[in-house]
């Protein structure tokens, strides 16, 4: 198999293969694995499958620091975030909102995390960077792992929410078996 990280612009289902358009390039595959996280529904819809996939958005702030202020992760459950010392500063991460793929980041969430972080550690430095991550989520919290109901040559592996790293290896083994028709 091959791994391609590029936007799929079209998908044509043929009798024994799937043709994927990547911009101007078209490639035929015997099977495809859709593991595009929060963007997986775009391809699933091209196949004809519909999933209630949404996006959990989590926010992160990296604070500058010239000294080690904490020696273990610090959780503040009241505000729903953690502070973690990493090599280039202190990361504050947390909070979750269901807001889809296209909505702009919520600056109030970043401001709240910064404000609450400074309550816990007033000696935090300047904000070095901020970012927002998008986790694929489904209403029942269960990931989509398995063959498409519309096309046996399409295999899905997405929707792991907060446990993608934890379930990644197990999902990989299942997908490997499915792709070889061992399951």
PLM regions and their residue ranges:
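Hydrophobic/aromatic beta-strand patches that form the interior of the parallel beta-sheet core
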Residues: 4, 33, 155-157
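A conserved short coil-to-beta-strand element within the FAD-binding core of flavoproteins
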Residues: 4-18
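Short loop/edge segments at beta-strand edges and connector loops
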Residues: 4-7, 22, 128-131
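Short beta-strand element of the conserved SAM-dependent methyltransferase core
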Residues: 11, 61-63, 157
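Active-site substrate-recognition segment that forms the wall
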Residues: 17, 27, 31-152
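Short beta-strand segments that buttress and anchor functional surface loops
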Residues: 20-22, 159
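C-terminal lid/capping helical subdomain adjacent to the catalytic/cofactor pocket in oxidative enzymes
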Residues: 142-183
